[in-house]
Amino acid sequence: MAYLIQGETGEWEIVIGLEVHAQVISNAKLFSGAATAFGAAPNSQVSFVDAAFPGMLPVINEVCVEQAVKTGLGLKAQINLRSVFDRKNYFYADLPAGYQISQFQQPVVGNGTIVLDLADGSTREVGIERLHLEIDAGKSLHDQHPSKTYVDLNRAGVALMEIVSKPDMRSPEEAAAYLRKLRTILRYLGTCDGNMEEGSMRCDVNVSVRKVGQPYGTRTETKNVNSIRYVQQAIEYEAQRQVELIEGGGTVVQETRLWDPNKGETRSMRSKEEAHDYRYFPDPDLLPLEIEQSWVDRIKETLPELPDDKKARFMADYGLSAYDAGILVAERARADFYETVAKGRDPKLAANYVIGDLLGALNKTGRDITESPIAADDLGGLIDLVTDGTISGRIAKDVFAEMLETGEKPSLIVEKKGLRQVTDTGAIDKAIDEVMAANADKVAEFRSGKEKLFGFFVGQVMRATQGKANPALVNEILATKLKG
């Protein structure tokens, strides 16, 4: 169903494009040998190149180029064998050279595509316009001193991939799905860790509104939004603001805006620059970047199985629904965990335990699968205990809760607590006789035609045996006894 804003003059459509700045996983910066570790002491990872000392020349880091090419291949994008680095000129205190090295007209990666998995089970393609390499700026710290701004250049020179989407998204939910899918692909590839809270993946949000079928409206760009939730909120607020502005007789100005999460609103930051404002020109210190097709082919051979392919395989090989397969492949570690659990077992039962029980429990405590106290082999062991009749499904829930708390193996918990399923027909006979004796009136009702009471008797017997009785045996013996 289309996402439309109901204005006073009719329905308005949102047009969304996203520019994602993804920090490249690399031990060194794009043009210097300085380290890139997060959380280092201020200005402790800065080379003379990063600080723009006179006479210092940039030398390209091949690993960063390889990571960009790998990402382009993961996005099914065109890899340009010749690309050019340009100087993007602007002044800011945390940009010591007075320019950023970026790629303007000839990026390393061209058109690509991402397939979104939406909440209603449908999919949608979003085009990738380009991916280019550039260096990050430093960081200005305004909250360290009442009257001074401090500058930390640790981030200056760190390699970024700017991944620019086409304006193909039409709702905040699609934008969120795009960011989640892009982050998943980057993590599968190992080219960016996607940690938005650390700033290694940041998003600029381009929003415009129009009446359905009309030309694109004037867009605004909301800079450096650092969580998927904030991206959704910024889109909702900005689209509503533009509709109200236009319907009130105003005009949307092409400008750069800032998202204020405390107030839940965007606010004007500066007028939006055009490309000519930056006076782009090829960097005279860097030759055009030329790569060989054979090198690209070698990188392609090293690509892992990507989320879309893995999802299709899970559906085909394991018989999983698109929804369950989508949840399992959303994180590479999660998919690997599931495959270990499912090996040699009922794949749908394994999916139920991983998604319904384990992920549900981890989500409540804000943990992901890599922090699970239950190992994949141990969860598989719990499933084995249920399928071979050692414990009942009811007891399995108690064992699972204990595993979650202690990390102990399921077999040890079962033995220690005496939870083995009761298959002794004599013991089950006795429990049934006691339940029937205590509920003689209900036995009479059952025998007079109230067969729905059968479930009541099963529940009473299971309670009497503390859930340990074999359900199939209980059903069989109980049915015989109740018939008299």
Swiss-Prot record:
EC number(s) per entry: 6.3.5.-
InterPro entries per UniProt: Asn/Gln-tRNA_amidoTrfase_suB/E, Asn/Gln-tRNA_Trfase_suB/E_cat, Asn/Gln_amidotransferase, Asn/Gln_tRNA_amidoTrase-B-like, GatB, GatB_C_1, GatB_Yqey_C_2, Gln-tRNA_amidoTrfase_suB_CS
Keywords on record: ATP-binding, Ligase, Nucleotide-binding, Protein biosynthesis
Catalytic activity: L-glutamyl-tRNA(Gln) + L-glutamine + ATP + H2O = L-glutaminyl-tRNA(Gln) + L-glutamate + ADP + phosphate + H(+); L-aspartyl-tRNA(Asn) + L-glutamine + ATP + H2O = L-asparaginyl-tRNA(Asn) + L-glutamate + ADP + phosphate + 2 H(+)
Keyword ATP-binding assigned: yes
Gene Ontology terms describing biological process: glutaminyl-tRNAGln biosynthesis via transamidation; translation
SMART domains (alphabetical): GatB_Yqey
A Pfam family annotated for this UniProt entry: GatB_N
Domain of life: Bacteria
SUPFAM superfamilies noted in UniProt: GatB/YqeY motif (SSF89095), Glutamine synthetase/guanido kinase (SSF55931)
HAMAP family named in the record: GatB
Family: Belongs to the GatB/GatE family. GatB subfamily.
Subunit structure: Heterotrimer of A, B and C subunits.
Role of this protein: Allows the formation of correctly charged Asn-tRNA(Asn) or Gln-tRNA(Gln) through the transamidation of misacylated Asp-tRNA(Asn) or Glu-tRNA(Gln) in organisms which lack either or both of asparaginyl-tRNA or glutaminyl-tRNA synthetases. The reaction takes place in the presence of glutamine and ATP through an activated phospho-Asp-tRNA(Asn) or phospho-Glu-tRNA(Gln).
Protein name: Aspartyl/glutamyl-tRNA(Asn/Gln) amidotransferase subunit B
